[in-house]
Amino acid sequence: ITQTLRKQVAEGRTSHAYLFTGTRGTGKTTCAKILAKAVNCEHPMDGDPCCQCPSCVGIENGSFLDVLELDAASNNGVDQVRALRDEAIYAPANVKKRVYIVDEVHMLSTPAFNALLKILEEPPEHLMFILATTELHKVPATILSRCQRFSFKRITPQDIAARLLYVAGQEQIDLTADGAELLSRLADGALRDGLSLLDQCAAVGGTVDSRAVLEALGLAGNLQTAQLMEFILSRDAKGALLQLDQLYQGSKDVGAVLGELSTLVRDLLLRRTAPEGGA
């Protein structure tokens, strides 16, 4: 995705409308902000923004109103979109392109989508829309057909763990490799969730290893989850209920325990069907 967008910016062939789709925390909004800086950068480098010119700095700190981020979840009415449309016809004051980043665009009402469609059909040369959504099926086909679509996939646990270790080093957080590995699995492909979990664990203080993560987040851990799975597989209802009660009495998050159980089942199935592959 980034290579394609870089090439478009470098060659001056950007679209007037983009649609970024994918699960939460995969970088859609972050990428949209970088793209907004790149198309307005005064000294771009192979499609990347320099992040030092007045345009890049102004967009980053939010002082340039020509680049606006709108949360459709709280601004989903037709009046807000019409106001945006009326403003969009004017040339930008400080940058080359006026960019509107509309997050959670699927939350717009039907009249709001219709109002948005009108400007997507005949956009001014100076205008760019970047729409982001976690629920693509809720976006009307008329909107989809007028956007370049990019699908953001879940980030691999290895990449999340590497990023968490980097951030921990920058923030002087004592994060161990096993702690980063566990956090990366709990993040479920969303780097933002991984960073939030790291902050939560670091707030407790001390070394953030796998044991500290389990304690801070109220998780059962591999051993207790495996024991629960053994009771289930052996059809020992009493043992399973006693194990669950023990976890509950130990202030473990039952919902999280069920999530761990689901992950364990997935890993077991993967090992059974593809023993040479990785889970």
Regions found by a protein language model. Give the residues of each.
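P-loop/Walker A NTP-binding region and its immediately flanking N-terminal helices
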Residues: I1-R149
